[in-house]
Amino acid sequence: MSNSQKPPSLQPNEIIKRTKPDYNWKVIVELGKGGYGTVNKVIKVNEEGFAIDDKEYAMKTEQKFASKHSSRLKIERNVMASYSKCDAQCKEHFPELIDFGQSPVWKWIVMTIVGPSLEELKMKYKPSDIPPSTILQCGLQTMKAIHDFHQIGFLHRDIKPANYCIGYGSKSETIYVLDFGLARKYRLPEWYCSRASHRCEELGRRDDYESWFFMFIDLVDTTLIDWKGLTRPDAYAKKQELFTKLKTYEKEPMFKVISIYLDTLVYDSDVKFGFLRDAITDYARSCKLTLKEPLVWFKERNDNESGSTPTTSATACSPSSSTGTGTGTGVSKIASNIDQKSIASDRNEENSLDGSKTGTWKSTKTRNKKPSRK
Protein backbone atom coordinates (compact mmCIF):
# COMPACT_ATOMS: atom_id res chain seq x y z
CA MET A 1 0.00 0.00 0.00
CA SER A 2 1.44 3.37 -0.99
CA ASN A 3 1.53 6.36 1.31
CA SER A 4 -1.06 8.10 -0.86
CA GLN A 5 -3.60 5.39 -0.17
CA LYS A 6 -5.50 5.43 3.08
CA PRO A 7 -6.95 2.27 4.57
CA PRO A 8 -10.64 2.15 5.43
CA SER A 9 -11.72 3.07 8.93
CA LEU A 10 -12.54 0.34 11.39
CA GLN A 11 -16.26 -0.33 11.29
CA PRO A 12 -18.69 -0.71 14.23
CA ASN A 13 -18.93 -4.37 15.32
CA GLU A 14 -15.67 -5.22 13.54
CA ILE A 15 -13.63 -7.81 15.47
CA ILE A 16 -9.90 -7.23 15.92
CA LYS A 17 -8.19 -10.58 16.41
CA ARG A 18 -5.36 -10.92 18.91
CA THR A 19 -2.40 -13.30 18.88
CA LYS A 20 -3.53 -14.74 22.18
CA PRO A 21 -6.95 -16.43 21.95
CA ASP A 22 -8.24 -15.53 25.44
CA TYR A 23 -10.18 -12.54 24.08
CA ASN A 24 -10.49 -10.24 21.06
CA TRP A 25 -11.49 -6.60 20.56
CA LYS A 26 -14.81 -5.41 19.16
CA VAL A 27 -15.19 -1.91 17.72
CA ILE A 28 -18.14 0.07 19.14
CA VAL A 29 -17.78 3.53 17.63
CA GLU A 30 -15.14 5.83 16.17
CA LEU A 31 -14.02 8.57 18.56
CA GLY A 32 -11.58 10.44 16.38
CA LYS A 33 -9.63 10.35 13.14
CA GLY A 34 -6.24 11.60 12.01
CA GLY A 35 -3.82 11.42 9.11
CA TYR A 36 -2.51 7.97 9.94
CA GLY A 37 -5.38 6.23 11.68
CA THR A 38 -8.33 6.37 14.02
CA VAL A 39 -9.30 6.17 17.68
CA ASN A 40 -12.19 3.83 18.45
CA LYS A 41 -14.12 2.82 21.52
CA VAL A 42 -13.71 -0.96 21.91
CA ILE A 43 -14.72 -3.75 24.29
CA LYS A 44 -13.34 -7.20 25.07
CA VAL A 45 -15.25 -10.09 23.50
CA ASN A 46 -14.91 -13.87 23.48
CA GLU A 47 -14.47 -16.07 20.41
CA GLU A 48 -18.22 -15.94 19.79
CA GLY A 49 -18.16 -12.14 19.79
CA PHE A 50 -19.99 -11.64 23.09
CA ALA A 51 -18.83 -9.04 25.61
CA ILE A 52 -16.68 -10.42 28.41
CA ASP A 53 -17.44 -7.53 30.78
CA ASP A 54 -18.90 -4.02 30.75
CA LYS A 55 -15.57 -2.16 30.52
CA GLU A 56 -14.81 0.15 27.60
CA TYR A 57 -11.39 1.04 26.19
CA ALA A 58 -9.83 3.24 23.52
CA MET A 59 -8.02 1.65 20.56
CA LYS A 60 -5.60 3.92 18.74
CA THR A 61 -4.53 2.79 15.27
CA GLU A 62 -1.85 3.71 12.79
CA GLN A 63 -1.54 2.65 9.18
CA LYS A 64 0.75 -0.35 8.81
CA PHE A 65 2.80 1.30 6.07
CA ALA A 66 3.85 4.22 8.30
CA SER A 67 7.63 4.32 8.10
CA LYS A 68 9.86 3.34 10.97
CA HIS A 69 10.85 6.99 11.40
CA SER A 70 7.32 8.41 11.20
CA SER A 71 5.62 5.87 13.46
CA ARG A 72 4.40 7.88 16.42
CA LEU A 73 2.38 4.91 17.65
CA LYS A 74 5.57 2.91 18.07
CA ILE A 75 7.10 5.65 20.22
CA GLU A 76 3.87 6.01 22.16
CA ARG A 77 3.73 2.28 22.86
CA ASN A 78 7.35 2.30 24.03
CA VAL A 79 6.71 5.16 26.44
CA MET A 80 3.55 3.58 27.83
CA ALA A 81 5.25 0.21 28.25
CA SER A 82 8.04 1.97 30.13
CA TYR A 83 5.83 3.71 32.68
CA SER A 84 3.63 0.63 33.10
CA LYS A 85 6.42 -0.73 35.31
CA CYS A 86 6.26 2.25 37.69
CA ASP A 87 4.45 2.45 41.02
CA ALA A 88 0.79 3.47 40.86
CA GLN A 89 1.34 6.89 42.45
CA CYS A 90 3.91 7.75 39.76
CA LYS A 91 1.51 7.13 36.87
CA GLU A 92 -1.83 8.40 38.15
CA HIS A 93 -1.94 11.00 35.35
CA PHE A 94 -1.08 8.57 32.52
CA PRO A 95 -3.51 6.32 30.62
CA GLU A 96 -2.83 2.62 31.11
CA LEU A 97 -1.52 0.51 28.24
CA ILE A 98 -3.88 -2.46 28.03
CA ASP A 99 -2.84 -4.25 24.85
CA PHE A 100 -1.22 -3.81 21.44
CA GLY A 101 -0.82 -5.68 18.20
CA GLN A 102 -1.14 -5.45 14.45
CA SER A 103 -3.26 -6.60 11.54
CA PRO A 104 -2.47 -6.64 7.80
CA VAL A 105 -3.55 -2.97 7.62
CA TRP A 106 -3.18 -1.50 11.12
CA LYS A 107 -0.85 -1.26 14.05
CA TRP A 108 -2.84 -0.61 17.22
CA ILE A 109 -2.64 -0.01 20.93
CA VAL A 110 -5.46 -0.23 23.47
CA MET A 111 -5.52 2.05 26.48
CA THR A 112 -7.88 3.25 29.16
CA ILE A 113 -10.60 5.45 27.74
CA VAL A 114 -10.71 9.11 28.78
CA GLY A 115 -13.12 12.02 28.70
CA PRO A 116 -12.94 15.38 26.90
CA SER A 117 -9.70 17.31 26.52
CA LEU A 118 -9.04 20.59 28.27
CA GLU A 119 -9.23 22.22 24.84
CA GLU A 120 -12.78 20.89 24.40
CA LEU A 121 -13.74 21.95 27.92
CA LYS A 122 -12.42 25.47 27.27
CA MET A 123 -14.81 25.71 24.34
CA LYS A 124 -17.72 24.14 26.22
CA TYR A 125 -17.74 26.32 29.33
CA LYS A 126 -18.18 30.07 29.58
CA PRO A 127 -15.46 31.86 31.58
CA SER A 128 -17.95 32.61 34.35
CA ASP A 129 -18.84 28.91 34.64
CA ILE A 130 -15.38 27.74 35.73
CA PRO A 131 -14.61 28.38 39.42
CA PRO A 132 -11.12 29.56 40.43
CA SER A 133 -10.61 26.33 42.37
CA THR A 134 -11.08 24.27 39.22
CA ILE A 135 -8.56 26.40 37.29
CA LEU A 136 -5.91 26.10 40.01
CA GLN A 137 -6.47 22.36 40.39
CA CYS A 138 -6.08 21.98 36.63
CA GLY A 139 -2.79 23.84 36.88
CA LEU A 140 -1.55 21.59 39.66
CA GLN A 141 -2.62 18.32 38.04
CA THR A 142 -1.26 19.16 34.60
CA MET A 143 2.05 20.25 36.14
CA LYS A 144 2.24 17.08 38.26
CA ALA A 145 1.77 15.03 35.08
CA ILE A 146 4.84 16.73 33.56
CA HIS A 147 6.83 16.15 36.74
CA ASP A 148 5.98 12.44 36.75
CA PHE A 149 6.75 12.13 33.04
CA HIS A 150 10.19 13.61 33.60
CA GLN A 151 10.73 11.28 36.54
CA ILE A 152 10.44 8.25 34.25
CA GLY A 153 13.02 9.80 31.92
CA PHE A 154 11.11 11.43 29.09
CA LEU A 155 10.36 14.87 27.68
CA HIS A 156 6.84 15.21 26.32
CA ARG A 157 7.55 18.05 23.81
CA ASP A 158 3.89 18.52 22.87
CA ILE A 159 2.30 20.14 25.92
CA LYS A 160 -1.02 21.80 25.06
CA PRO A 161 -4.65 21.66 26.26
CA ALA A 162 -5.62 19.18 23.53
CA ASN A 163 -3.18 16.64 25.00
CA TYR A 164 -4.70 16.71 28.48
CA CYS A 165 -7.99 14.89 29.06
CA ILE A 166 -10.16 14.39 32.10
CA GLY A 167 -10.98 10.86 33.18
CA TYR A 168 -14.00 9.03 31.86
CA GLY A 169 -17.19 9.00 33.91
CA SER A 170 -16.52 8.66 37.63
CA LYS A 171 -12.80 9.39 37.09
CA SER A 172 -13.42 12.87 35.69
CA GLU A 173 -11.66 14.54 38.64
CA THR A 174 -8.33 13.20 37.39
CA ILE A 175 -6.53 14.85 34.47
CA TYR A 176 -4.43 12.67 32.17
CA VAL A 177 -1.62 13.65 29.83
CA LEU A 178 -1.67 11.80 26.51
CA ASP A 179 -0.23 11.60 23.03
CA PHE A 180 3.40 10.60 23.52
CA GLY A 181 4.24 10.39 19.83
CA LEU A 182 6.76 13.26 20.04
CA ALA A 183 8.27 12.14 23.36
CA ARG A 184 12.03 11.81 23.58
CA LYS A 185 14.63 11.06 26.15
CA TYR A 186 15.95 13.88 28.16
CA ARG A 187 7.77 20.17 18.00
CA LEU A 188 5.58 21.93 19.81
CA PRO A 189 2.44 23.76 18.72
CA GLU A 190 3.16 27.43 18.06
CA TRP A 191 0.83 28.73 20.77
CA TYR A 192 2.42 26.97 23.70
CA CYS A 193 5.95 26.02 22.60
CA SER A 194 8.80 27.36 24.72
CA ARG A 195 11.11 30.18 23.64
CA ALA A 196 14.01 27.72 23.30
CA SER A 197 12.00 25.89 20.62
CA HIS A 198 11.79 29.15 18.64
CA ARG A 199 15.58 29.45 18.92
CA CYS A 200 16.01 25.87 17.61
CA GLU A 201 17.82 24.87 20.80
CA GLU A 202 17.91 21.42 22.35
CA LEU A 203 14.80 21.11 24.52
CA GLY A 204 15.07 20.14 28.18
CA ARG A 205 12.77 19.61 31.13
CA ARG A 206 12.49 23.36 31.60
CA ASP A 207 10.79 23.67 28.21
CA ASP A 208 7.96 21.25 29.04
CA TYR A 209 7.29 23.43 32.09
CA GLU A 210 7.40 26.63 30.06
CA SER A 211 4.85 25.18 27.62
CA TRP A 212 2.74 24.18 30.62
CA PHE A 213 3.07 27.75 31.96
CA PHE A 214 1.74 29.28 28.74
CA MET A 215 -1.13 26.78 28.83
CA PHE A 216 -1.90 27.62 32.48
CA ILE A 217 -1.81 31.35 31.76
CA ASP A 218 -4.27 30.80 28.92
CA LEU A 219 -6.63 28.99 31.30
CA VAL A 220 -6.45 31.85 33.78
CA ASP A 221 -6.46 34.91 31.51
CA THR A 222 -6.68 34.52 27.73
CA THR A 223 -5.86 38.20 27.17
CA LEU A 224 -2.22 37.52 28.05
CA ILE A 225 -1.71 34.97 25.27
CA ASP A 226 -1.90 37.33 22.31
CA TRP A 227 0.33 35.64 19.72
CA LYS A 228 -2.12 33.10 18.29
CA GLY A 229 -1.94 33.24 14.51
CA LEU A 230 1.34 35.19 14.40
CA THR A 231 4.50 34.10 12.61
CA ARG A 232 7.17 32.27 14.63
CA PRO A 233 9.44 35.35 14.96
CA ASP A 234 6.53 37.54 16.05
CA ALA A 235 5.24 34.90 18.47
CA TYR A 236 8.72 34.57 19.98
CA ALA A 237 8.92 38.34 20.48
CA LYS A 238 5.51 38.32 22.17
CA LYS A 239 6.58 35.53 24.52
CA GLN A 240 9.71 37.45 25.47
CA GLU A 241 7.58 40.52 26.16
CA LEU A 242 5.20 38.48 28.30
CA PHE A 243 7.99 37.09 30.48
CA THR A 244 9.33 40.61 30.99
CA LYS A 245 5.83 41.82 31.89
CA LEU A 246 5.12 38.96 34.29
CA LYS A 247 8.24 39.63 36.36
CA THR A 248 6.54 42.78 37.68
CA TYR A 249 2.96 41.53 37.34
CA GLU A 250 0.96 42.14 40.51
CA LYS A 251 -2.48 41.12 39.27
CA GLU A 252 -1.62 37.40 39.51
CA PRO A 253 1.36 37.12 41.91
CA MET A 254 1.87 33.42 41.14
CA PHE A 255 2.66 34.33 37.52
CA LYS A 256 5.40 36.66 38.75
CA VAL A 257 6.94 33.96 40.96
CA ILE A 258 6.78 31.26 38.28
CA SER A 259 8.12 33.42 35.42
CA ILE A 260 11.11 34.61 37.46
CA TYR A 261 11.93 31.05 38.48
CA LEU A 262 11.62 29.58 34.96
CA ASP A 263 13.99 32.22 33.60
CA THR A 264 16.71 31.04 36.00
CA LEU A 265 16.72 27.56 34.47
CA VAL A 266 18.98 26.21 31.74
CA TYR A 267 18.88 23.07 29.60
CA ASP A 268 19.91 20.53 32.24
CA SER A 269 18.38 22.24 35.28
CA ASP A 270 16.49 20.03 37.71
CA VAL A 271 13.12 21.79 37.83
CA LYS A 272 11.84 22.10 41.39
CA PHE A 273 8.28 20.87 41.11
CA GLY A 274 7.61 21.65 44.78
CA PHE A 275 8.49 25.31 44.28
CA LEU A 276 6.06 25.67 41.37
CA ARG A 277 3.35 23.77 43.21
CA ASP A 278 3.76 26.02 46.24
CA ALA A 279 3.44 29.12 44.06
CA ILE A 280 -0.08 27.99 43.15
CA THR A 281 -1.14 26.66 46.55
CA ASP A 282 0.20 29.76 48.36
CA TYR A 283 -1.76 31.93 45.97
CA ALA A 284 -4.91 29.88 46.58
CA ARG A 285 -4.40 30.27 50.32
CA SER A 286 -3.93 34.03 50.04
CA CYS A 287 -7.21 34.24 48.10
CA LYS A 288 -8.95 31.95 50.62
CA LEU A 289 -9.64 29.39 47.89
CA THR A 290 -9.98 25.71 48.68
CA LEU A 291 -8.39 23.21 46.33
CA LYS A 292 -10.57 20.38 47.57
CA GLU A 293 -13.75 21.43 45.78
CA PRO A 294 -14.92 19.02 43.05
CA LEU A 295 -13.87 20.06 39.57
CA VAL A 296 -16.75 21.81 37.83
CA TRP A 297 -17.37 19.02 35.29
CA PHE A 298 -17.32 16.37 38.04
CA LYS A 299 -19.84 18.36 40.08
CA GLU A 300 -21.97 18.84 36.96
CA ARG A 301 -21.89 15.12 36.32
CA ASN A 302 -23.03 14.32 39.86
CA ASP A 303 -25.76 16.97 39.71
CA ASN A 304 -27.11 15.66 36.40
CA GLU A 305 -26.48 11.97 36.83
CA SER A 306 -29.54 9.77 36.73
CA GLY A 307 -27.69 6.60 37.58
CA SER A 308 -26.88 5.50 34.04
CA THR A 309 -24.89 7.39 31.41
CA PRO A 310 -22.00 9.65 32.52
CA THR A 311 -22.12 13.20 31.17
CA THR A 312 -18.46 13.21 30.21
CA SER A 313 -18.20 11.72 26.74
CA ALA A 314 -15.46 9.29 25.84
CA THR A 315 -12.64 10.55 23.70
CA ALA A 316 -8.99 10.02 23.00
CA CYS A 317 -6.18 12.00 21.41
CA SER A 318 -6.29 12.05 17.65
CA PRO A 319 -3.66 9.88 15.98
CA SER A 320 -2.54 13.01 14.17
CA SER A 321 -2.53 15.97 16.53
CA SER A 322 -4.20 19.18 15.45
CA THR A 323 -4.21 22.53 17.17
CA GLY A 324 -7.60 23.74 18.26
CA THR A 325 -8.71 27.31 17.80
CA GLY A 326 -11.46 27.48 20.35
CA THR A 327 -12.09 30.35 22.72
CA GLY A 328 -10.24 30.09 26.03
CA THR A 329 -11.89 30.33 29.40
CA GLY A 330 -10.42 33.72 30.31
CA VAL A 331 -10.94 33.21 34.03
CA SER A 332 -9.31 36.41 35.26
CA LYS A 333 -11.70 36.26 38.22
CA ILE A 334 -9.10 34.12 39.99
CA ALA A 335 -7.74 37.29 41.56
CA SER A 336 -11.14 37.94 42.97
CA ASN A 337 -1.87 -7.20 31.13
CA ILE A 338 0.45 -6.35 28.43
CA ASP A 339 1.39 -9.01 25.86
CA GLN A 340 5.07 -9.40 26.83
CA LYS A 341 5.71 -11.76 23.93
CA SER A 342 4.75 -9.03 21.48
CA ILE A 343 7.08 -6.59 23.21
CA ALA A 344 9.95 -9.06 23.00
CA SER A 345 9.34 -9.75 19.31
CA ASP A 346 9.85 -6.09 18.43
CA ARG A 347 12.54 -5.34 20.98
CA ASN A 348 15.40 -4.97 18.50
CA GLU A 349 13.38 -2.43 16.56
CA GLU A 350 11.67 -0.58 19.38
CA ASN A 351 13.92 -0.60 22.45
CA SER A 352 15.10 2.91 21.87
CA LEU A 353 14.00 6.50 21.68
CA ASP A 354 16.77 8.69 20.31
CA GLY A 355 19.03 5.66 20.59
CA SER A 356 18.64 5.14 24.35
CA LYS A 357 16.75 2.36 26.09
CA THR A 358 13.37 3.09 27.58
CA GLY A 359 13.30 3.57 31.30
CA THR A 360 16.79 5.06 31.49
CA TRP A 361 17.72 8.70 31.84
CA LYS A 362 20.93 8.99 29.84
CA SER A 363 20.91 10.15 26.25
CA THR A 364 23.29 8.89 23.58
CA LYS A 365 24.44 12.45 22.97
CA THR A 366 27.18 13.83 25.17
CA ARG A 367 25.88 16.95 26.86
CA ASN A 368 28.99 18.48 28.33
CA LYS A 369 28.09 21.90 27.09
CA LYS A 370 24.94 23.80 27.92
CA PRO A 371 23.21 25.34 24.91
CA SER A 372 23.24 29.11 24.80
CA ARG A 373 20.13 30.83 26.17
CA LYS A 374 20.90 34.18 24.61
From Swiss-Prot:
Keyword Cell wall biogenesis/degradation: no
One GO biological process term: signal transduction
Transmembrane segments: none
PROSITE patterns on file: PROTEIN_KINASE_ATP, PROTEIN_KINASE_DOM, PROTEIN_KINASE_ST
The protein's Enzyme Commission number: 2.7.11.1
Disordered as annotated region, ranges: 302-374
Molecular functions per Gene Ontology: ATP binding; protein serine kinase activity; protein serine/threonine kinase activity
Polar residues composition bias: residue spans: 334-343
Keyword set, alphabetical order: ATP-binding, Kinase, Nucleotide-binding, Serine/threonine-protein kinase, Transferase
Catalytic EC class: transferase
Compositional bias annotation for Basic residues: 364-374
InterPro entries, per database record: CK1_Ser-Thr_kinase, Kinase-like_dom_sf, Prot_kinase_dom, Protein_kinase_ATP_BS, Ser/Thr_kinase_AS, TTBK_Asator-like_STKc
KW Membrane (keyword) present: no
Low complexity: bias regions: 306-324
SMART domains (alphabetical): S_TKc
Active-site annotation: D158
Binding site for ATP: L31, G32, K33, G34, G35, Y36, G37, T38, V39, K60
Catalytically driven reaction(s): L-seryl-[protein] + ATP = O-phospho-L-seryl-[protein] + ADP + H(+); L-threonyl-[protein] + ATP = O-phospho-L-threonyl-[protein] + ADP + H(+)
SUPFAM superfamilies with a match to the protein in the record: Protein kinase-like (PK-like) (SSF56112)
Ranges of residues in domain Protein kinase: 25-296
GO CC term, one of those recorded: nucleus
CDD domains registered for this protein in UniProt: STKc_TTBK
Family: Belongs to the protein kinase superfamily. Ser/Thr protein kinase family.
Protein name, entry field: Putative serine/threonine-protein kinase ZK507.3
Organism, scientific name: Caenorhabditis elegans
